[in-house]
Amino acid sequence: MRVVILGSGVIGVTSAWYLAQAGHQVTVVDRQEGPGLETSAANAGQISPGYAAPWAAPGIPLKALKWLFQRHAPLAMSLDGSLFQLRWLWQMLRNCDSTHYAQNKARMVRLAEYSRDCLAQLRRTTTIDYEGRQLGTLQLFRTPQQYENAARDIAVLREAGVPYRLLPTAQLSTVEPALAVAGVRLSGGLHLPHDETGDCQLFTRHLAQQAAQSGVHFIFSTQVLRLLRSGARIQGVQCGHDTLVADAYVVALGAYSTGLLQDIVAIPVYPLKGYSLTLPIDDPDAAPRSTVLDESYKVAITRFDRRIRVGGMAEVVGFDMSLPLARRRTLERVVRDLYPRGGLLPQASFWSGLRPATPDGTPLVGATPLENLYLNTGHGTLGWTMACGSGQLLADIISGVTPTIRVDDLSVSRYTA
């Protein structure tokens, strides 16, 4: 089968890889000069199935109001009055109760755990290198209340069979030794030993190279203009001055998927803006070993080979890609608090990206009401965590193979029904 994939971020490239491995003729189109140059370029770097959780959670509406008046708030928003933004926010609020939170987190963990297994299999069968580490993730609590609230997430982890350790303050340095000299008081942490880390852009670039060697055709520096519909099918996609024709089409354009699909199928995928710093390591012994997550600021600090990636926060501000100095200061503050001698902050590069977020936190993977149009988007902050699993599931669905895990609650039908 001929398959055209729109988008060459980590989601588009993993989709291409698994579809090619299933025997399909795959073409990938992207407006950038190469793979992984937008949202996949500088994300936080953690592959954290156990921490897969929606922003829509109990208590978030009240917290969001408080955060509006805080200098270093993890969530911010700027209302533009658009119906799409208001509808998305309303749908998110409807998912903030305990029942929806547990349901959404459970399916996110299911997909993320499966994806980590797919990534492990990919490492075994290829020579791919992405500065990966398999040393777990440590969530840090600055307040006793955060430590106590961990019980809610632990219940979901236990049900999903995810190993974990709830650590008192004195044991944090057994996982991350450099925290022994942290510049801030901590109240404990939650350690997930099976989580991983790695450079998402490096992975995307190297997998694209191996996909090309397997026959995948990449078309870069080409705008995806519109899908050509005829009845219940897509007949082609207009890309630049050309029209590409295939048997199946996959939209993996991240936050830009919504605009392309607006006259075809309505999807609630909104650009959730995030930021990161990438800085060279100063003292390896004073740097993190893997990934730590600061619960107060919703910021992750991740160790690569010779670099530290600091990423997080969420802004509902549309497609604004500006780099406010205040956001940089927040990331710098978290680094100074936790790893004051770990990295060279004056040499840090500052980046922003738009995560494609759904109101319930779960991505849109699979078929649409059009018989040959498929989605792989809406992964929010977990695109790197869920990429391999989403790509494999999509390949199974298109190939008519029964997926290994449940997929019916990942499709767009939960919003269009």
UniProtKB/Swiss-Prot annotation:
EC number: 1.4.99.-
Keyword Flavoprotein: yes
UniProt cross-references to InterPro entries, sorted A to Z: DadA, FAD-dep_OxRdtase, FAD/NAD-bd_sf
Enzyme class: oxidoreductase
Pathway involvement of the protein, from the record: Amino-acid degradation; D-alanine degradation; NH(3) and pyruvate from D-alanine: step 1/1
Pfam families membership: DAO
A GO biological process held by the record: D-alanine catabolic process
Cofactor: FAD
Keywords of the record: FAD, Flavoprotein, Oxidoreductase
Binding locations of FAD: 3-17
Catalyzed reactions: a D-alpha-amino acid + A + H2O = a 2-oxocarboxylate + AH2 + NH4(+)
Any one annotated GO CC term: cytoplasm
Molecular functions per Gene Ontology: D-amino-acid dehydrogenase activity
Task performed by this protein: Oxidative deamination of D-amino acids.
HAMAP family linked: DadA
Family designation: Belongs to the DadA oxidoreductase family.
PANTHER family: D-AMINO ACID DEHYDROGENASE, SARCOSINE DEHYDROGENASE-RELATED
Protein name: D-amino acid dehydrogenase
Organism of this sequence: Edwardsiella ictaluri (strain 93-146)
